[in-house]
């Protein structure tokens, strides 16, 4: 079930918290060494799509927190309620104030200003190609890293000999069952 893997995601990334450590990388140059040090970005913006808003939130939230970041979540204006409900549940977990924040609104009036905010150091965006293009352009203005997943709608091939009713059912259930509507 979705609830099961979402819970497992939190446990998995909670187990990663103490795995982010530096390491010495050998160098062939005398008297020189390379050191890899993992550091949190600080504030990470998580911008969510309308379809599977909770699933996408967990995929983004758990690793961002495990890496030591604070987050600002911007759910889709078409599916904000499930995110807001999860936040009210997380408030009961006695998390530090300001660790997880939510802003709602449209991409142009809320998402773009969030991306361009000076305190936001990294963006994780899932949505359509038009929104992704605007998000990427805004992030590039401030030279901020952005991770994007754009327009995935479970494409499928349906062959001539396929059971059409079963195929249509599969296509629809690949997109809509956890959309937050």
Enumerate the predicted regions with their spans.
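Long amphipathic alpha-helix in the N-terminal Rossmann-like dinucleotide-binding domain
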Residues: 1-21
């Amino acid at each position: 079930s979705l609830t099961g893997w979402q819970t497992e995601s939190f446990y998995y990334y909670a187990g990663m918290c103490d795995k982010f450590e530096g390491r010495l990388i050998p160098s062939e140059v005398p008297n020189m060494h390379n050191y890899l040090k993992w550091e949190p970005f600080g504030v990470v913006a998580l911008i969510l799509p309308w379809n599977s808003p909770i699933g996408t939130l967990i995929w983004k939230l758990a690793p961002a927190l495990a890496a030591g970041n604070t987050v600002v979540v911007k759910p889709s204006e078409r599916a904000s309620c499930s995110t807001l409900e999860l936040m009210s549940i997380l408030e009961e977990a006695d998390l530090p104030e300001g660790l997880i924040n939510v802003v709602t609104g449209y991409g142009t009036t809320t998402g773009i200003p969030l991306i361009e905010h000076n305190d936001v150091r990294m963006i994780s965006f899932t949505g359509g190609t038009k929104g992704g293009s605007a998000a990427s352009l805004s992030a590039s203005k401030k030279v901020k890293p952005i991770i994007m997943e754009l327009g995935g709608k479970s494409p499928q091939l349906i062959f001539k000999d396929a059971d059409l009713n079963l195929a249509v059912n599969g296509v629809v259930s690949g997109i809509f069952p956890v959309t937050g509507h």
